[in-house]
C-alpha cells in the first residue's frame, strides 16, 4: 500500500514513473461488456465477525483466502462524476489493475442494482478513452474530463470470499475488512456483500434471510464510495433529515407510487439508523418514525393491496419496534435479528413485488391507474379526516389523537408531490406545528395551530376548483 499512498500524493508525471516499478500483467486494453451489478450489502458488527465467518464456512461453498484490494477513487474539483451519479476507480489486486466506471442505478435498502464497466489495465493509471462512449451522458467523453479528474479517496481492505450455489443461482459472498481513507480522515470497513454472479435475485434474498438469522448484520445503503466522499468533504456529522414530500414521476402508476413511498420510508429508516449507531441518540425517534411511515404507506394503499399481502412484513415490523423501544443499546437494537429481518423483508417485498399474487383482476386494473388521480382523491379524504377530528377543541384529549394526526401527515407527505412545493409546505406546517405543540404540551400553541390548520385552503385539485 505504500506505493499506492505515494501515487495519491503525486502528480500525473510522477504516477507514471512509479508505475514502472509496479508489477505489470499481460492484459490487452479491452473493456468488459456492461454488467448489471446486483449485490446486497451488510454492515457487520465487528464483534460478530468470527461467528459470521464460522457460519459462512458451513455453507459448503468454494472458499477463497483473504486477498488485499486497494482502490483509488477519482473525481473532479466540481464533483462532475458525482453529479452524474457516476463512480470511477482503479482497483489493484495481486499485481493486476482494473478501471471501473459505475453509472446510475437503483438502491433499495441495501440491494444495489447498477450497471458497471470494467477495463483491464497494465498499470494503475487512468485512461478514460478506454471506456465505451455509451458510458458518458452525451455519448462521448467530455473533452477536458481526463485532465480534471484526480484522486479523492482510497480504500484498502482484505476480501475473503465464498462462492455458493442457491437454487441454481451462483452467489459470491465477500467479507471485507479494512478502511476507507481521505486525507487525515478514515473509518473502518467491516462489510459483507452478496453479489449475484448468475441466476435470480430471489436467491440472493433467500441466502440473506439465512444469514440474518444470526445477530450482527444490518443492511447498509451507504457504499464504500459514499462513505469516502463524505470523508473527503471533511466528515462533518450528519444531521436529522425530515421526511421530504414524495416526488413521483408525472405519469406514475399507483403501483409506482406505492414503490416510491416504501423506498422513501426505507431510506429514512436506514439513514437515521446510521446516525443512531454512530452516537446520535436523537435519531432513534426518527428510526421509529420511518418504520411508522412504512405502516402508513401500507394503509394508504390498503384499498388496493389487501392486508394479507403484507401480514408477514407487518409482524416483523412489530417485533423490531418492540426491540427498539426497549432499553437496549443502539448497537444491540440495530444489529438484532429482529431489525435485520424486518428491513430485509421490506426490501424483499419491494424487489419481488410481493403484493402482486394477492391482487385480483380488478385490483390489477386499479393499481395500474394514475397515481396523480389517486393522490387528489386521498388528499381530500385525509384533509376531511383531519378537519373532522380537530374541527373543535379537544381539551385534554389531543394526545389521544396523535397517532391519527401523524398518520394523516405522513399520508399527505406521500401524496402531495405533484403540487407547488411552497404551497404544500405552508399547508403542512400548520398540521406539523399542531403535532409538535401537542407533543410538547403547549396549550396556547395547540389552539393557534389548530385554528390555522382547519381553515386553510386546499392546495390540490378538489371538487373541480383547481
Mark where each language-model region is.
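Function-determining surface determinants
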Residues: 34-466
Amino acid at each position: 500500500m505504500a506505493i499506492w499512498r505515494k501515487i495519491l500524493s503525486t502528480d500525473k508525471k510522477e504516477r507514471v514513473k512509479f508505475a514502472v516499478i509496479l508489477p505489470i500483467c499481460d492484459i490487452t486494453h479491452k473493456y468488459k461488456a456492461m454488467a448489471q451489478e446486483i449485490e446486497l450489502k451488510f454492515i457487520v458488527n465487528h464483534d460478530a465477525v468470527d461467528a459470521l465467518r464460522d457460519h459462512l464456512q458451513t455453507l459448503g461453498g468454494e472458499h477463497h483466502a483473504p486477498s488485499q484490494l486497494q482502490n483509488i477513487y477519482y473525481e473532479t474539483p466540481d464533483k462532475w462524476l458525482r453529479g452524474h451519479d457516476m463512480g470511477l476507480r482503479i482497483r489493484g489486486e495481486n499485481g493486476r489493475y482494473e478501471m471501473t466506471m459505475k453509472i446510475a442505478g437503483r438502491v433499495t435498502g441495501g440491494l444495489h442494482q447498477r450497471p458497471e464497466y470494467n477495463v483491464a489495465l497494465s498499470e494503475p493509471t487512468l485512461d478514460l478513452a478506454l471506456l465505451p462512449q455509451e458510458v458518458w451522458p452525451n455519448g462521448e467523453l467530455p473533452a477536458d474530463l481526463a485532465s480534471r479528474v484526480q484522486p479523492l479517496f482510497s480504500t484498502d481492505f482484505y476480501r475473503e470470499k465464498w462462492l455458493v450455489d442457491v437454487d441454481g443461482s451462483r452467489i459470491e459472498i465477500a467479507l471485507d475488512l479494512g478502511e476507507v481513507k481521505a486525507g487525515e480522515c478514515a473509518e473502518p470497513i467491516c462489510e459483507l456483500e452478496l453479489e449475484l454472479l448468475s441466476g435470480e435475485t430471489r436467491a440472493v434474498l433467500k441466502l440473506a434471510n439465512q444469514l440474518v438469522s444470526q445477530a450482527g448484520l444490518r443492511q447498509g445503503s451507504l457504499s464504500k464510495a459514499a462513505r469516502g466522499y463524505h470523508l473527503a468533504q471533511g466528515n462533518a456529522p450528519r444531521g436529522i433529515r425530515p421526511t421530504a414530500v414524495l416526488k413521483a414521476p408525472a405519469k406514475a402508476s399507483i403501483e409506482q407510487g406505492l414503490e416510491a413511498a416504501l423506498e422513501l420510508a426505507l431510506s429514512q429508516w436506514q439513514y437515521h439508523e446510521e446516525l443512531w449507531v454512530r452516537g446520535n441518540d436523537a435519531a432513534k425517534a426518527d428510526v421509529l418514525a420511518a418504520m411508522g411511515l412504512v405502516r402508513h404507506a401500507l394503509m394508504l394503499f390498503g384499498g388496493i393491496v389487501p392486508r394479507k399481502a403484507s401480514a408477514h412484513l407487518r409482524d416483523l415490523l412489530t417485533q423490531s419496534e418492540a426491540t427498539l423501544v426497549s432499553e437496549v443499546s443502539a448497537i444491540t437494537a440495530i444489529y438484532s435479528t429482529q431489525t435485520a429481518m424486518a428491513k430485509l423483508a421490506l426490501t424483499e417485498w419491494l424487489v419481488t413485488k410481493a403484493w402482486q399474487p394477492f391482487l385480483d383482476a380488478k385490483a390489477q386494473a386499479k393499481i395500474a391507474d394514475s397515481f396523480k388521480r389517486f393522490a387528489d382523491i386521498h388528499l381530500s379524504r385525509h384533509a376531511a379526516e383531519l378537519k373532522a377530528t380537530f374541527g373543535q377543541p379537544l381539551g385534554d384529549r389531543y394526545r389521544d389523537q396523535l397517532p391519527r394526526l401523524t398518520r394523516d401527515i405522513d399520508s399527505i407527505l406521500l401524496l402531495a408531490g405533484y403540487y407547488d412545493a411552497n404551497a404544500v409546505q405552508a399547508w403542512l406546517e400548520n398540521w406539523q406545528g399542531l403535532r409538535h405543540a401537542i407533543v410538547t404540551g403547549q396549550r396556547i400553541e395547540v389552539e393557534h395551530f389548530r385554528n390555522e390548520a382547519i381553515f386553510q385552503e386546499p392546495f390540490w385539485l378538489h371538487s373541480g376548483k383547481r
